[in-house]
């Protein structure tokens, strides 16, 4: 049963203080029972509202990120593959690379969990309040190519330069056209200038990326800065994917 004045409820709705509204009855009951003093009552309501706003903001950031799946380190099975550098990956979860404005490169064979780890890292960034974005490299390049065609390139590339951290998944999958190489150069240069990290996942080792660019000058200018200032993690071993397939049984 509600013990709250309807006029107060309406005022909280008008002020968009739904966090306070949702917990007001419980906080009033705590106060009447002597569990909270008057100042503690106000502080509790304030914390309830802050928690509600932070939760709503995180939900919005995760929606804008366009993840393939909501992946976190808590649901990643580090024991599935003894070859994974677990200590190095957990160190990345501390986000010191983010504070330093440094990028991360996760490379290795298909199915070892590179995309999961990348998304888990930016999920942690989002929980800390940063805007993040996930993109398949090929789809991003196709999107930017469309911008050249309809003269919306500047608007489209801002979607990838604006977030604090950008994941480029499946980087260096195939040879790039000159236009794709130029677009990557502009994107990576812009993010480097503003100190916004990238997280790249790739099936190729970074030293094998250079030959995928038609212009070696562009390749060296783009990749040297990126590779030499990034944390490079080799993720090797058996595929992680069979363990995630529905209906799989273990012996």
From Swiss-Prot:
Record-linked InterPro entries: AAA+_ATPase, DNAC/IstB-like, IstB, IstB_ATP-bd, P-loop_NTPase
Q: Where does ATP bind?
A: 108-115
Q: Which GO terms describe its cellular component?
A: plasma membrane
Q: Which GO terms describe its molecular function?
A: ATP binding; ATP hydrolysis activity
**What keywords sit in the KW lines?**
ATP-binding, Nucleotide-binding, Transposable element
List, alphabetically, the SMART domains matched: AAA
Which terms does the UniProt entry file under GO BP?
A: DNA replication
SUPFAM superfamilies in the record, alphabetically? Answer: P-loop containing nucleoside triphosphate hydrolases (SSF52540)
Any other noteworthy remark? Was identified as a high-confidence drug target.
The similarity annotation says: Belongs to the IS21/IS1162 putative ATP-binding protein family.
- PANTHER family (UniProt xref): ATP-BINDING PROTEIN RV3427C IN INSERTION SEQUENCE-RELATED, CHROMOSOMAL REPLICATION INITIATOR PROTEIN DNAA
Q: Which NCBIfam families match?
A: IS21_help_AAA (NF038214)
Supply the name of the protein.
Putative ATP-binding protein Rv3427c in insertion sequence
Upper classification of the organism: Bacteria, Bacillati, Actinomycetota, Actinomycetes, Mycobacteriales
